[in-house]
């Protein structure tokens, strides 16, 4: 069959089914097709299709290889196109030995560093990779305070190593509506979770 390589951003809902009536179709995505990828959109929209996935090397593996970070205990998160708070960043880092973040030019290294400093997680270490595999590739590592004013690279992943992770028990996560005053919560759930964790309660 003739293979057509299509740019995923130009696909409409009707183009793929029409093309598959006569052709095989290849969709190219960058990085790991099974992690925050367009593959999930295609699979969910067309569950009956016979799809063969050919994996590539993702940016998390590339970053880990640069700094010798193994991923057995890693937690994976994303600031790219997803809602987050400084508290949610800190809450993830507090609980895990290693936390990976997908970043963007708008939300990335600077926001992670500021969140870690805000929640007194200065004993952590940040590992940053930008433009990995490109000629403009750059990597950095250091304490969070070194990156609080850093510019956010557009193509970037960040890992944070926490030497003293502590799981946060379910009892910590009382909902915000348990702390209402005049119809508004007095504190945020993420703030309460990190404070209790830092107090070792």
Please place each PLM-identified region on the residue numbering.
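Generic structural signal for well-ordered alpha-helical scaffold segments
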Residues: 17, 43, 90, 196-200
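Class I S-adenosyl-L-methionine
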Residues: 1-52
């Amino acid at each position: 069959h003739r293979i057509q390589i299509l740019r995923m951003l130009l696909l409409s809902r009707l183009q793929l089914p029409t093309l598959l009536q006569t052709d095989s179709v290849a969709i190219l995505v960058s990085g790991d097709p099974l992690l925050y990828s367009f593959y999930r959109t295609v699979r969910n929209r067309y569950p009956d299709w016979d799809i063969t996935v050919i994996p590539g090397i993702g940016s998390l593996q590339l970053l880990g290889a640069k700094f010798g970070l193994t991923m057995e205990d890693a937690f994976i998160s994303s600031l790219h196109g997803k809602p987050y708070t400084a508290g949610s960043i800190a809450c993830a880092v507090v609980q895990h030995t290693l936390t990976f973040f997908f970043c963007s030019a708008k939300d990335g290294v600077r926001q992670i560093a500021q969140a870690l400093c805000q929640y007194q997680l200065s004993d952590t270490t940040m590992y940053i990779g930008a433009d990995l595999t490109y000629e403009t590739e750059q990597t950095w590592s250091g304490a969070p305070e070194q990156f609080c004013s850093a510019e956010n690279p557009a193509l970037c992943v960040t890992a944070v190593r926490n030497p003293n992770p502590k799981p946060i028990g379910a009892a910590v996560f009382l909902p915000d509506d348990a702390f209402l005053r005049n119809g508004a919560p007095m504190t945020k759930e993420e703030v309460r979770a990190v404070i209790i964790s830092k107090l070792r309660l």
